[in-house]
């Protein structure tokens, strides 16, 4: 059985940056956000169901899902969020578990923003949390996604608080510093964790 390291953190914490550093070391990465995008690509059955429910205006001109519009819609209408989650979550979980089962590397990095909220930590042998100050989260998310502070604060409120997240952590990467100046530090931390996870995985599979 592949050793599973669950990677999580709040919005704007830098999960993708950390995941890419592990990926550069040859570690297979399964990202819930990537899976969520892949299962609703143009022409997919799930996208058709989303269009039937929300209408054609939820699409971009090229026929792809307009994620910004969808995000704003479910922010304004909680009942739509419930419907969407009921549609997508089983499909996302099924695809992630399929990908986990076919891995042959000693361990896999499983990137799930709502790892704790969706009670998925039980699937992990180790939990790695990317931790930042709430102010950093807001600043980064606003710059990255061009979202309103209202929407970002709403997303943060829907996630577990920082203290709760840290209680689930076996390992923590502090990521408040500016990325450009802090990248060597992050690379070194990821390399240290990589060696640690290889040892743990090899011990489990011995």
UniProtKB/Swiss-Prot annotation:
Q: Name the chemical reaction catalysed here.
A: 3'-dephospho-CoA + ATP = ADP + CoA + H(+)
- Where's the DPCK domain? 4-204
> What is its subcellular localisation?
Cytoplasm
Mainly localized where? cytoplasm
Q: In which pathway does it act?
A: Cofactor biosynthesis; coenzyme A biosynthesis; CoA from (R)-pantothenate: step 5/5
Its Gene Ontology cellular component terms are:
cytoplasm
Explain the purpose of this protein.
Catalyzes the phosphorylation of the 3'-hydroxyl group of dephosphocoenzyme A to form coenzyme A.
Entry's family note: Belongs to the CoaE family.
What is this protein's record name?
Dephospho-CoA kinase
The record lists the organism as Pasteurella multocida (strain Pm70)
The gene designation is: coaE
